Amino acid sequence: MRGVTPTRIRLALAAGTSAALVAASLARPVETQVKAFNFVRIADDIYHAVGTGAMTVGCNGAVIVNADDVLVVDSHISPDVATALRDELKAITPKPIRFVVNTHFHFDHAHGNQTYGPGVEIIGHEFTRAQIASGESMRGRSYASFVGTLPAQIAQMKERAAAAPAAERSKLESQIDITERHYRATQAVKPVPPSVTMTNAMTLYRGGREIRLLFLGRGHTGGDVVVHLPKERVLATGDLLGPNPGYLGDAYMTDWVDTLEQLKPLDFDVVLPGHGDAFRGKEKIDHWQAYLRDFWTQARQMHDAGVGAEDAARRIDLRPHAGHYPALTQAGVNVNGVLRAYELIEGKIR
C-alpha cells in the first residue's frame, strides 16, 4: 500500500493505481490488447504487471514465466482483478499459474487470493498468513481508510459530476463507473491466507531458474517478502521499497530502516515495486531510509511534546526530502502513520 496522503491514495485507487511504463531503456510493453494490465517486459519471461486504469487493480504485480509454469507476485485488490490478470496473461503464455506470492497481508496485494484454486500454491510469510486468517486484512484503520470510505468517495464524485461542465462530467462519470465496480468487487472478497508459509527464506527451482523468497525483517508490515531473481538481477519488493514514499499505517519504522540495509548486499539491477514505476539501482534505498528516520524523529518529538496525532500529522514536515520525492510540496503526512508511530513509542505494538 503506497503512502503520502489519504487523498493521493484514494485518487490512485480510483484511477486503478496505474503506473507509467518503464523507460524504453529499461523495458518495453508487450502488445497484448489487455484492458486491465500492461505487461511490461523487464527481461526474458519476466514482466511487471501494471494497471492501465480501466480497473482499480490496487497494486502492481510481477509475472515470472518458468519452463513449465508461472509465478505471480501478489494477487491484487479483488477477485475481479485477479481474474482479469489470469485471463489477460494468456496473451503472454499458455502456461498455468502454479505459484502466487503474497508480499504482505494488505488488501490491495492479497484480496485476489480466492481466485486461485487448489492447483495453485499461495506463498507468504507466517505473519501474513496469521493476519489474513484472523481477518485483519479486512478490518482496522488501514482498510477503513481506503475501502470503508468508498461509498463517500462515490457520492462526492457524483456531486462533482452533476455540477461539472460536459467534458469534465464525462471523465468523472468514467471514474465513478470504475470506482463503483471496484466497490462491488470488494463486497465479494473472501480472504484466503497463504497455503505455504516461510519464516526467513525459501528457494524455488523452476527449470533453470532460481527464485529466492526472502524475509529480511519487519518494515511496511511484520511480514514483508521480497522476490529475488539472482541470475536475472531483478528484485520484486512489494511495498518494502518503491520510487515514492510508502504507507506507514502498519509499519515498524525503525525496523524498516534496518531491513532496507539488508537489501543492499543482494545482487540486483532492477526493482519491481508494488506501486510506481520499475527502476534501476540501489540509490532509492538510502533515500527511503533518510525519509523514515526523519519521520520517526519528528513523530517522537511531537509525541514527547504532548502533541495529538492529528495535529502532528499536519505539522510533520518532510519537504527536505522533496529532491528525491517531488510530490512533497507541503507539510503534512497521513495521520495513520502518526497513529502507528505513537503506538510503537508507547509500546502498544511490539
PLM features per residue range, with description:
Residues 2-16:
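Bacterial N-terminal signal peptides that target proteins for export
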Residues 40-90, 225-239:
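Conserved beta-strand hairpin/beta-sheet module of binuclear metal-dependent hydrolase folds
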Residues 41, 173, 187-229:
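Core dinuclear metal-dependent hydrolase active-site scaffold
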Residues 81, 87-194, 203, 297:
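Active-site HxH/HxHxD metal-binding segment of metal-dependent hydrolases
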Residues 210-266:
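Active-site-proximal loop/helix segments of hydrolase catalytic cores
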